[in-house]
Structure formats: structure tokens, C-alpha cells
Amino acid sequence: QQLIQAGCKSVHIERFWRNWYSGKPLNRSKVRLPAAAEAILPQMEEYLANQLTAQEKAESETGTRWVLKASDGQLIECVLLPREGVCVSTQVGCAVGCVFCMTGKSGLIRQLTDLEVAGQVQYAMRNAPVKKVVLMGMGEPSHNLRSVFSAVEHIVRYSGIGYKEVVISTVGDKRLFKALMESQIKPALAISLHSAMDEKRRSLLPRAAELTVKEILEFGAKYAEVGKYPIQYQWTLINGVNDGVDEIEALASLWSRQAILNMI
């Protein structure tokens, strides 16, 4: 918005954000900015640099985990994945309270802005090649729809990553499902299922939206048809809880062809 107010045209704005994702300073010899934009550029670059700063880094065989500090001091996690992917957070904390997830122990602290979501992608791209973005870190994307959709649109438009390579991971929510169907951009979708039995699933995801497994899978099949891309279902195996034959039989009775089951 500041660039527009300073007289920038779409070509200036596009080059600015593309350079931001690449970590390169704007080449003023290639794109001549209006004088008003030139004047505010240093403060804009400083503002963006201060949105997220690295606090910790931990490397393992499964990826590189960064703890990033937001401008208000809150901490979030961002993980560089194998095969040029990055997992980003959408909230500080989470309200869902999945029994196997540590993030929900603290509850929801605050929403991330669209710039903070996109900024995690930018931070990863400055440090390694990134071709896929997974919104599967801290937080529940369906509880922060405005920032999530704005960030996804920004990432797709300026980072060079296609919308099919952006995955929104959710426990399932009618508001998100409606927004996805109405959106021109159709990102890939991953749904945290974890059980094919309604009562058991509610015990594992105690504060998830009131949707039956059947309703979730029916939407998944519909979205896969519209988006021309299979839905991913996530299943964290818990010994003696959701790893029995009864789960297999229940899931088989509801399963759609246009789906992938990822067991963790």
C-alpha cells in the first residue's frame, strides 16, 4: 500500500516483492522508482527485515528448524524440509489442543499477519532452495483465514512457487472449506484426520470444528475434483489408540480415490 501511495506501478511492486523473496536488494538501475518511493525504500526494507529475526537453529536428518522472533517478541517455528520444502506457522500457539501436539498446550496467543506468514517463506528462501510451502507449523490455518489467504496469494504471485506447491493443513472447518471453494487460487489441501471414528477423533482433536469424518471426506472428494489434485489426509499413529483393524475398516468404508493417506 505504501508503494502504491508513493506512485509505484505494478511493475515496480512486482520487482520489489520478487527481490524480497530472493533476498536481493532492489536493482534501481533496472527499475526506476518514483522519487517518493525511492525516499521510503530504506525504511520499508528495514521494516521488513525486523518482522522476523532468527533466534535458534537446529539441524537434523529430517530438516532444519528455526525459531524466529516476531517484532513483538513472540516466537514461532519454521522448518526447512527435505526435497526443498518449508513448513511455516500461521499462529502463535493454537486453540485446537490436539493431544499429540505441543503447540496447543499454551492455547492461542495471537494470529500471525500475512506478512509474518510469507516472511517465513522468504527467510527459508534466503537460506536454501524452496519449491514447496506447507502451512503445517504452529497454529490452525482455518482460524486465521484472512492472513492465510492473503499470504498464499502473495507467495504464489511473487515467490515463483506455484499454487499446487502450497499446502494448507487443517483439522477441518466449514469456513475454510467455503473459502477454498470460492477462491480463484486452489492450493493443495491436507486434512488432519487421525481417526475414521467420530467420537475417537473428537477425543484426539478436542476443540476442532464439529464435522463428522464423513463430512470431511465428502468435502475432500469435492475439492479434489474441483482442484484437480488429490487431498492429503494426515494420520498420526498412536499405539493402541488409532492403529487397529477397526480404524482400517471404518476408513475403507468412507475412502475416496482422489486422496492420499500420510501416516506419521
What are these regions (language model features)?
Residues 55, 67-69, 79, 89, ...:
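Residues in well-ordered beta-strands of folded domains
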Residues 1-84:
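Flexible, acidic/Gly-rich N-terminal and inter-domain linker regions that tether
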Residues 125-132, 137-264:
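Conserved AdoMet/S-adenosylmethionine-binding subsite of the radical SAM
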Residues 77, 116, 120, 140, ...:
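Acidic-residue sensor for enzyme active/binding pockets
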Residues 71, 81-83, 91-93, 104, ...:
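Generic beta-structure capping elements
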Residues 81-116, 123:
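Canonical Radical SAM [4Fe-4S] cluster-binding loop centered on the CxxxCxxC motif
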